[in-house]
């Protein structure tokens, strides 16, 4: 398998394209496409900003087919309703998330699912799985097309056996590396917030993510994107240094998703 970084109009015959539009506590959104079908995973920025970041990478908002929601926190659903109505997009989410996310509606169309039960958005096969986080029904996803598999798990406090099972054998991973424990402990956050972040329903530390990546590495893993980094309690170079230690059996490209600008479009052929 060959991985390339190019603009969409310059790349042909790919199985999956991925672009992290934003990642962090101020807003999250990920673009995934197989060409005929394009989706957003979360829409945690304003609709205007999401469309701007898409077009900055040569991606057309008009080509979107659906929005897939991980959970109902505002940094993941801020413009779900707006984009759904403007672009006439169905919104895929669980019933528990739907109840909590209704304040962002109305939605153009709602399609519900439950974790553990795979479903399809055209030719994209989506497998949702439960994550431990302080939300109504937080989800991770694997998305598969033509034998290529993307794994996505952010906003989780611990790595469960279920998480490892679903994320194994992916060709591209987007995983959380939220904080450095020492930076969090010595940082400005109030103690209750520090406790929440470190709890089993909080966010993964660099060390926890390192252990996860160590378990998931395999010869066909080509790209790892570190996501949801805290701007206060972590630093990109610190996260990269920690996570690179896990990669003893393979050498995927390891990058950090940004809060402030969209990443490159990554193609899996």
What are these regions (language model features)?
Residues 1-57, 139-154, 172:
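Conserved beta-strand hairpin/beta-sheet module of binuclear metal-dependent hydrolase folds
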Residues 2, 19-29, 70-80, 98, ...:
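Structured catalytic core of nucleotide-sugar glycosyltransferases
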Residues 2-5, 94-147:
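Metallo-beta-lactamase
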Residues 22-23, 43-45, 72, 131-134, ...:
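Active-site metal-binding loops of divalent metal-dependent hydrolases
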Residues 41-44, 64-72, 92-95, 151-154, ...:
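Active-site neighborhood of phospho(di)ester-bond hydrolases with catalytic His/Asp-centered motifs
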Residues 47-93:
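Active-site metal-binding motif and surrounding structural segment of the metallo-beta-lactamase
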Residues 74-77, 98-100, 135-136, 159-161, ...:
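Active-site environment of divalent metal-dependent phosphoester hydrolases
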Residues 161-258:
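Cap/insert and terminal regions of metallo-dependent hydrolase folds
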């Amino acid at each position: 398998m060959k991985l390339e970084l190019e603009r969409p109009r310059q790349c042909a015959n790919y199985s999956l394209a991925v672009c992290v539009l934003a990642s962090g506590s101020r807003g999250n959104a990920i673009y995934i496409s197989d060409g005929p079908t394009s989706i957003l995973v979360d829409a945690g920025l304003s609709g205007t900003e999401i469309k701007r970041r898409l077009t900055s990478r040569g991606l057309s908002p008009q080509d979107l087919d659906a929005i897939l929601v991980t959970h109902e926190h505002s940094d993941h659903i801020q413009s779900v309703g707006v984009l759904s109505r403007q672009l006439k997009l169905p919104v895929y989410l669980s019933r528990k998330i739907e109840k909590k996310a209704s304040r962002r509606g109305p939605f153009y169309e709602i399609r519900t699912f439950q974790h553990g039960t795979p479903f399809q958005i055209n030719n994209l096969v989506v497998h949702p799985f439960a994550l431990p986080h302080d939300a109504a029904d937080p989800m991770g996803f694997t998305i598969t097309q033509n034998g290529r598999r993307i794994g996505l798990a952010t906003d989780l406090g611990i790595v469960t056996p279920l998480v490892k099972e679903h994320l194994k054998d992916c060709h591209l991973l987007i995983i959380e590396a939220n904080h450095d424990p020492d930076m969090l402990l010595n940082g400005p956050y109030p103690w209750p917030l520090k406790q929440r972040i470190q709890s089993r329903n909080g966010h993964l530390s660099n060390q926890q993510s390192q252990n996860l990546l160590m378990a998931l590495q395999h010869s066909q893993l080509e790209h790892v994107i570190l996501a949801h980094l805290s701007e206060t309690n972590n630093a990109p170079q610190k996260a990269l240094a920690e996570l690179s230690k896990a990669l003893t059996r393979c050498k995927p490209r390891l990058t950090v998703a940004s809060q402030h600008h969209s990443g490159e479009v990554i193609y899996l052929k």
